């Protein structure tokens, strides 16, 4: 068993050798995860349907489509995991191997989600800082290629993590090396996300040549902020605390469930962010989900957007008179 995902074992221990109180799962948190995942799956399914079948593909929409796919995958893993925890709580049968597999499977969408978010922030940062170079040298299908590479790399890391954890008892050094690689990769992604987001924020808000604020940059900023608050703690718990061999006793052994709830909130919040940003300052009669999502991903300043909308309405009125 991979020590990075040994939270199931720490929570089901009746009494440890130090005499600390029993650390059983908190049922309220499991039900909270169930509710959060259902809401998040509904929102991400709508995003997948709109971007996959109802809207024209653009560079940013390819990233958002894959991010919604990673969030849905992650929420599915935690939905089933919480269901098994509730079954265990009431004394019904739940195979331990299934929970271990789910714990390792959730690593795949977690890595891919962070990678896609870092790619979005980095690409928009390059577009703002060096626009001419970016538009001249960017390959046409770069978004799809990057997302495909991210998924392949995430699956390879997830499979390696599971396999090394399976052999962890006899090959202790193996899972340590694999976990070190995954931890280093996550730290690199976090630094890339933080650096590119900070540079993008400074370029938009500060300096003599500030870039006009658009809905797309508001969407990216809110998504990154929610991830840093809600999504990052789970990664710190799984890949740093357990890699350094920190054993959490009561009441800190419940940190895994708390970070799981926060990470589910992070994956569920992204569709809400898209629809809130897209529906801001929009007339109610024009609030179709497709239109709202399209506006949330538009890289057009508010003034230009208002002008284009006003010209479009004027054209429609003039055409209706003839």
From Swiss-Prot:
Glycans are attached at residue 16. GO terms for molecular function: G protein-coupled receptor activity. GO terms for biological process: chemosensory behavior; hematopoietic progenitor cell differentiation. Residues 52-59, 122-142, 201-223, 279-322 are cytoplasmic. It is found in: Cell membrane. Signal peptide: none annotated. One of its GO terms (cellular component) is plasma membrane. Residues 1-30, 81-100, 164-179, 245-257 are extracellular. The keyword Cell membrane applies. It is a multi-pass membrane protein. Keywords: Cell membrane, G-protein coupled receptor, Glycoprotein, Membrane, Receptor, Transducer, Transmembrane, Transmembrane helix. The chain crosses the membrane at residues 31-51, 60-80, 101-121, 143-163, 180-200, 224-244, 258-278. Expressed in a subset of IB4-positive small diameter nociceptive dorsal root neurons. Orphan receptor activated by neuropeptides terminating in Arg-Phe or Arg-Phe-amide. Mediates its action by association with G proteins that activate a phosphatidylinositol-calcium second messenger system. Its effect is mediated by G(q) and G(11) proteins. May regulate the function of nociceptive neurons by modulation of pain perception. PANTHER family: MAS-RELATED G-PROTEIN COUPLED RECEPTOR, MAS-RELATED G-PROTEIN COUPLED RECEPTOR MEMBER X3. Belongs to the G-protein coupled receptor 1 family. Mas subfamily. This is Mas-related G-protein coupled receptor member X1. It comes from Mus musculus (Mouse). The lineage of its organism: Eukaryota, Metazoa, Chordata, Craniata, Vertebrata.
């Amino acid at each position: 068993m991979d020590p990075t995902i040994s939270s199931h074992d720490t929570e089901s221990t009746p009494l440890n050798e130090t005499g600390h109180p029993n650390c059983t799962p908190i049922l309220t948190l499991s039900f909270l995860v169930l509710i959060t995942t259902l809401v998040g799956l509904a929102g991400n399914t709508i995003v997948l349907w709109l971007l996959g079948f109802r809207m024209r593909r653009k560079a940013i929409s390819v990233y958002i489509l894959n991010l919604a796919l990673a969030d849905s995958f992650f929420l599915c893993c935690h939905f089933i995991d919480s269901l098994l925890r509730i079954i265990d709580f009431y004394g019904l049968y739940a195979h331990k191997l299934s929970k271990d597999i789910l714990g390792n499977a959730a690593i795949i969408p977690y890595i891919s989600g962070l990678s896609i978010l870092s790619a979005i922030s980095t690409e928009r940062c390059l577009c703002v800082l060096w626009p001419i170079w970016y538009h001249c040298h960017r390959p046409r299908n770069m978004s799809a290629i990057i997302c495909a590479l991210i998924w392949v790399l995430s699956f390879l890391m997830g499979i390696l993590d599971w396999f090394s954890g399976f052999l962890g008892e006899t090959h202790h050094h193996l899972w340590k090396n694999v976990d070190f690689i995954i931890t280093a990769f996550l730290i690199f992604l976090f630094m890339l996300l933080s650096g590119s987001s900070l540079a993008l924020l400074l370029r938009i808000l500060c300096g003599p040549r500030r870039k006009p604020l658009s809905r797309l940059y508001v969407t990216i900023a809110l998504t990154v902020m929610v991830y840093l608050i809600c999504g990052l703690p789970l990664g710190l718990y799984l890949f740093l605390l357990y890699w350094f061999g920190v054993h959490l006793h009561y009441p800190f052994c419940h940190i895994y469930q708390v970070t799981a709830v926060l990470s589910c909130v992070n994956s569920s919040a992204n569709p809400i962010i898209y629809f809130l940003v897209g529906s801001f300052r929009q007339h109610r009669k024009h609030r179709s989900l497709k239109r709202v999502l399209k506006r949330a991903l538009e890289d057009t300043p508010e003034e230009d957007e208002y002008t284009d909308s006003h010209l479009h309405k004027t054209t429609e009125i003039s055409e209706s008179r003839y």
